[in-house]
Amino acid sequence: MASAYILIKTLPGHERDVYYKCFYIPEVCEAHPLVGEYSLIVKIKTDAYDTLGYIAADKIGKVGNITAAEILPVLDDSSMHQRLETPLQSVH
């Protein structure tokens, strides 16, 4: 399973319609409005890393009223998950 976060900038006043259009794309598992440089963050999941770009460009990119997007692929490494489960030591 491959996943990525996509930071999306929209035309002013179109945040809501872009949000709803993205939300109904089957590969989108999360969508959240943001305050700041980007209007939305969307999380997508697919079976393979090589299809992440297709979903970002051909599905989300064609939603309309998007001025820019940045895709951030997630690196899923089971050893990383194991390390993160270890409690952090306090630093003195």
Regions found by a protein language model. Name each.
Residues M1-H92:
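A compositional/biophysical signature of low hydrophobicity enriched in polar/charged and small residues
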